[in-house]
C-alpha cells in the first residue's frame, strides 16, 4: 500500500511555502510516494480553488522522485474548459518529468443531468492528450481541429482519479474507468462499501473505456501511534492501494507534520 501526504491549499492555516518544501523534501528522502495538493472545502461543502496547480509547479522544481497529485475541483464543462486543464496538467507533468497524478473533485453529488457533461469533459481531456490534433463534435460542444499543447510526459497521459465521498461517486469512478480516491473520512465499513461499489462498477465496463489502472485510495487522519499502525494494517488487509495522510492545518504545526511523515515512512508502519 502506497503512503502519501495530503495538503489542503487555500485554508487559513495553509503552511508557508518554504515550510511545505521542507516537509515534502523530508518525505521524498524517506520514500513517501506522493504529495497531494487539494483545494480546501468551505462550510457549504464547495471547494475553494486555492491554486494547487501553482504550488505543484513550484514543488516540481524542488523535488526529484516524489509524485505530485493535483486535486482539481469542478471538472464539469463549460464551467472549467477541459482545454485549459489539459494544458496546465501537461505543463506540470513536463516540468516534473512525468510525476503528475490528477484527481477530479465534484463540487457536489453528481446529479443525473450533470453526468453526461462530466463524462464528456473527461473524454475530451483524455483525447486532447492522446490525439496529435484535437477536434470534437457533440450536442453540447463543437471544437474545430486545434493543436492542444504541450502534451504530457507520461504516455498516454497522467493517471486520472475521481475523488469522492459516497458510493455513488465510487460507482461513477468505476463506470468512467478511473481510479477512485475516497475522501469521506468514513469508518472501515463505509470505506469497504465504497470500495465494493467501485470494483463492481468497473468490472462491468468495456476494457476499451478504461482511462486509468484500477486503484482505490483513502484520505484520512492518522496519528503517529500504535493505533495508527493497527489502522494501516487493517486498510492494507482490506485491499486499499494508497493511503493519504493530512499534514496541513495541524494543531502541532510543522513539528507534528514532520512527525506524521516520519511515522508514515517508518518500518513499523510498512506492514508488508
Give the positions of each predicted feature:
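N-terminal beta1-alpha1-beta2 module of alpha/beta enzyme domains
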Residues: 1-67, 158
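Active-site mouth loops of central-metabolism enzymes
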Residues: 5-18, 71-83, 154-164, 219-226
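Internal, glycine-rich beta/alpha segment that forms the wall or movable "lid"
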Residues: 78-178, 189-196, 200, 204-209
Amino acid at each position: 500500500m502506497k503512503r502519501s501526504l495530503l495538503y489542503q491549499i487555500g485554508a487559513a492555516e495553509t503552511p508557508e511555502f518554504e515550510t511545505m518544501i521542507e516537509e515534502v523534501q523530508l518525505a521524498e528522502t524517506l520514500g513517501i510516494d506522493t504529495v497531494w495538493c487539494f483545494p480546501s472545502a468551505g462550510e457549504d461543502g464547495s471547494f475553494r480553488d486555492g491554486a494547487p496547480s501553482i504550488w505543484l509547479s513550484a514543488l516540481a522544481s524542488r523535488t526529484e522522485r516524489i509524485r505530485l497529485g493535483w486535486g482539481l475541483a469542478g471538472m464539469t464543462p463549460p464551467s472549467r474548459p477541459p482545454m485549459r486543464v489539459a494544458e496546465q496538467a501537461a505543463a506540470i507533468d513536463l516540468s516534473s518529468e512525468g510525476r503528475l497524478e490528477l484527481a477530479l473533485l465534484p463540487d457536489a453529488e453528481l446529479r443525473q443531468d450533470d453526468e453526461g457533461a462530466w463524462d464528456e469533459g473527461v473524454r475530451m481531456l483524455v483525447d486532447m492528450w492522446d490525439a496529435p490534433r484535437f477536434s470534437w463534435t457533440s450536442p453540447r460542444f463543437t471544437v474545430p481541429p486545434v493543436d492542444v499543447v504541450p502534451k504530457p510526459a507520461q504516455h498516454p497521459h497522467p493517471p486520472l482519479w475521481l475523488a469522492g465521498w459516497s458510493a455513488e461517486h465510487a460507482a461513477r469512478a468505476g463506470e468512467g474507468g478511473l481510479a477512485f480516491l475516497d475522501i469521506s473520512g468514513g469508518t472501515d465499513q463505509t470505506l469497504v462499501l465504497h470500495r465494493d461499489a467501485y470494483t463492481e462498477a468497473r468490472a462491468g465496463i468495456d476494457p476499451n473505456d478504461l482511462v486509468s489502472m484500477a486503484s482505490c485510495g483513502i484520505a484520512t487522519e492518522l496519528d503517529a501511534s500504535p493505533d495508527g499502525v493497527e489502522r494501516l494494517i487493517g486498510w492494507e488487509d482490506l485491499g486499499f492501494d494508497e493511503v493519504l495522510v493530512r499534514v496541513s492545518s495541524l494543531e502541532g504545526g510543522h513539528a507534528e507534520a514532520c512527525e506524521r511523515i516520519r511515522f508514515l515512512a517508518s518500518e513499523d508502519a510498512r506492514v508488508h
